[in-house]
Amino acid sequence: MLMILLFQRLGIIMILAFLLVNNSYFRQLIEERSKREKLVLIIIFGIFVIISNMTGIEITSDKSLVERPILTTISHSDSLANTRTLVITTASLVGGPLVGTVVGFIGGVHRFFQGNFSGAFYIVSSALVGYISGRLGDQLKTNNLYPSTSQVIVISIIAESIQMLFVGFFTGWDLVKLIFIPMMLLNSLGSTLFLAILKTYLSNERQLRAVQTRDVLDLTQQTLPYLRQGLSQQSATKVCNIIKQHTNFDAVGLTDRTNVLAHIGVGQDHHIAGQAVKTDLSKSVILNGQPQIALDKTAIACPDQSCLLNSAIVVPLKINNETVGALKMYFSGDKKMTEVEENLALGLAQIFSGQLAIGIAEEQNKLANIAEIKALQSQINPHFFFNAINTISALIRLDANKARYALMQLSTFFRTSLQGGQDREISLEQEKAHVDAYMNLEKLRFPDKYQLDYHITVSTKMTLPPFGLQVLVENAVRHAFKERKKDNHICISITDQGEFYKVAVSDNGQGISPNMIDKLGQETVSESKGTGTALVNLNNRLNLLYGSASQLHFDSTDQGTTVWYEIPYQKGDKDEHFNS
């Protein structure tokens, strides 16, 4: 009889658990485990543990079972069979020792007051169960995954055994004989079911992210040749066809700021290339530069009453933070836009914006000085690009979040590279973002191999040549450390020297050979890992911009190398400063 009643209570807890795990906010909480997330988990499981106490089975002093819907109080001589230990164990496995201990303490305190100030030992036993379960769970985790089913069962048995030891010592072993087997089975089964549900959801989510990232990469590779041609009707039609073939959208469109460039799928009979943008939704996105989602025809606001498009996401395409068009994805019929489609559209728009920037830069390059542009373009090392792509491809299978992060870093790197190719000078902030993107990608390839530090005490308005830091940092990464696997430090220093800024990049590498150092920055060299063209190009641009006094200097010993140059002050340089 007790077993049946307890399993009824288990059903209540499992229903609540299913509703909880089905919530994306809760799944985010358990993956991050910051202080704020732990506090929220304590609140959630604290409520659960109180519910467990209040839905328990009352056992009188003569071992009779009393079933009441809600147990607000019980006699000090009575006991409870409940799911409290199950909730505490689950909280510990999900949130760790701290969450488990606090939830156990909450459950024990509530049980103490529920029993008319009897059973103080429950406070200690419940907190101890939470701590031990959490510690065991953390130690048994592999690859940031939860313990296996067999391990969860063992932890649950240990947790229930601890609780029963306290019950036996303080209330008598007859009660333990009555409730131990049902409670142990209940706790083991409940914890296993909860973790199984949770792991299934998390696994599906990770697989979905991996698929999304792979889809974005596939679409990026296929659309790159067309978007680099710029936004035209011909290139837009090719891109829309590719997206339509590789997604489940019913229609895909591209616009510039005023006209439809292409519309493939449902509605192409009246969303016609070359005509003005029709829908209020698209006009609003282009005007405000913010993505918008429409969940019905009214929100899309197409003037054609026969239009079958029922939901949409429209995302701006931007170059240098200026909206140049919009990517539009539609569903018809009863299909609705979900978070999956939203993330796909946002990711594509960001990548497409970068591809368009590449196209614009290439067009401008044709009109610029060919020799200088070739030198600038040499900064985007093709080996670095292919290494980054290979890293992202590997991460897709291992860690979708890291793959997405790497993709964004690569996008930042190329965007800042292309902006640098258009300008004679850029801000220190822009150059720093370029360096950070480069190093973040290198750190993904070689975790723990490099450490980059900044010592910057100058104005945020300071300008310097494009690649004025990145070239030197990349030079250190490629040449300074040879095969050394760790303790490789690079420091960027920009300081105020009175009449000029001193820009220096130092490393603790193995130094530069004396017969090589006089050639660097002055002429190309023959070396297995490069020719020094980037250093020559940077040195020439320093001379052109600031005169012969500003050129690369190399100080090197077997303890490391410092490469530095000077930049004269410019008006407004001392208004704002970094804190690095």
Swiss-Prot record:
Its main location: membrane. Residues 356-571 form the Histidine kinase domain. It is a multi-pass membrane protein. SMART domains: HATPase_c. GO terms for cellular component: plasma membrane. The chain crosses the membrane at residues 4-26, 39-61, 86-108, 115-137, 152-169, 176-198. Pfam families: 5TM-5TMR_LYT (PF07694), HATPase_c (PF02518), His_kinase (PF06580). It is an enzyme of class 2 (transferase). One of its GO terms (molecular function) is ATP binding. The modification Phosphohistidine is found at H383. Coiled coil: none annotated. It catalyses: ATP + protein L-histidine = ADP + protein N-phospho-L-histidine. It is found in: Cell membrane. It comes from the Bacteria. Member of the two-component regulatory system LytR/LytS that probably regulates genes involved in cell wall metabolism. PANTHER family: SENSOR HISTIDINE KINASE YPDA (PTHR34220:SF7). This is Sensor protein LytS.
